[in-house]
């Protein structure tokens, strides 16, 4: 029983200082609450700023995509302007000779070919004997020929690729099976 009395005295002595410290703890809790409320406000402000920044980034990205679509052919158009200039100059010549016309057309064709190359517009020029590739060639007719079946006999019209994407297939005549 002495042990119980001893424990009761210790518990009572512990409670007394605790109640004496209670007024000191309350301001600390109030300070913690105020600090927590301030932190919540700062986090809300930070969240709103991040959200606004994200929305601005998304808007700018969408504007960039819109601009890219709008001006996607600008480089190609810039490359074609000299070709048009050359054709207009050729039409202004009063009495052109056949030789000067041919020379002008050849120069204009070089300009056009350079514009195509600059913009990754490639020609599909199948040669006689090449295997028919349905991804790049369109067989217009099948003719008897002294070569392997399904090989190209002649090219009627060149095809074109834009950056590995088919723009127009080459029109070809193909050898028939024997």
From Swiss-Prot:
Coiled-coil regions listed: none
A GO term from the CC aspect: cytosol
Major subcellular site: cytoplasm
Name of the protein described by the UniProt record: Protein GrpE
Region (Disordered): 1-26
Family matches, as InterPro entries: GrpE, GrpE_coiled_coil, GrpE_head
Repeat listed as a keyword: no
One GO biological process term: protein folding
UniProt family annotation: Belongs to the GrpE family.
Species annotation: Herminiimonas arsenicoxydans
Localization per Swiss-Prot or TrEMBL: Cytoplasm
Keywords: Chaperone, Cytoplasm, Stress response
Pfam families attached to this UniProt entry: GrpE (PF01025)
Signal sequence residues: none
PROSITE patterns to which the protein is assigned, alphabetical: GRPE
Record-level Gene Ontology MF annotations: adenyl-nucleotide exchange factor activity; protein homodimerization activity; protein-folding chaperone binding; unfolded protein binding
Summary of the function given for this chain in its UniProt record: Participates actively in the response to hyperosmotic and heat shock by preventing the aggregation of stress-denatured proteins, in association with DnaK and GrpE. It is the nucleotide exchange factor for DnaK and may function as a thermosensor. Unfolded proteins bind initially to DnaJ; upon interaction with the DnaJ-bound protein, DnaK hydrolyzes its bound ATP, resulting in the formation of a stable complex. GrpE releases ADP from DnaK; ATP binding to DnaK triggers the release of the substrate protein, thus completing the reaction cycle.
Quaternary state and interactors: Homodimer.
């Amino acid at each position: 029983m002495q042990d119980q009395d001893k424990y009761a005295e210790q518990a009572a002595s512990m409670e007394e200082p605790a109640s004496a410290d209670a007024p000191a703890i309350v301001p600390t809790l109030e300070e913690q609450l105020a600090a927590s409320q301030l932190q919540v406000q700062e986090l809300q402000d930070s969240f709103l700023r991040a959200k606004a920044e994200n929305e601005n980034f998304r808007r700018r990205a969408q504007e960039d995509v819109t601009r890219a679509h709008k001006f996607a052919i600008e480089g190609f158009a810039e490359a074609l302007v000299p070709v048009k200039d050359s054709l207009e100059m050729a039409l202004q010549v009063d009495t052109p000779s056949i030789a000067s016309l041919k020379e002008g057309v050849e120069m204009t064709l070089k300009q056009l070919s350079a514009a195509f190359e600059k913009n990754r517009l490639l020609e599909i020029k199948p040669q006689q004997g090449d295997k028919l590739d349905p991804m790049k060639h369109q067989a217009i007719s099948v003719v008897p020929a002294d070569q392997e079946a399904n090989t190209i006999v002649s090219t009627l019209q060149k095809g074109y690729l834009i950056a590995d994407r088919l723009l127009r297939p080459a029109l070809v005549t193909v050898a028939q099976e024997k």
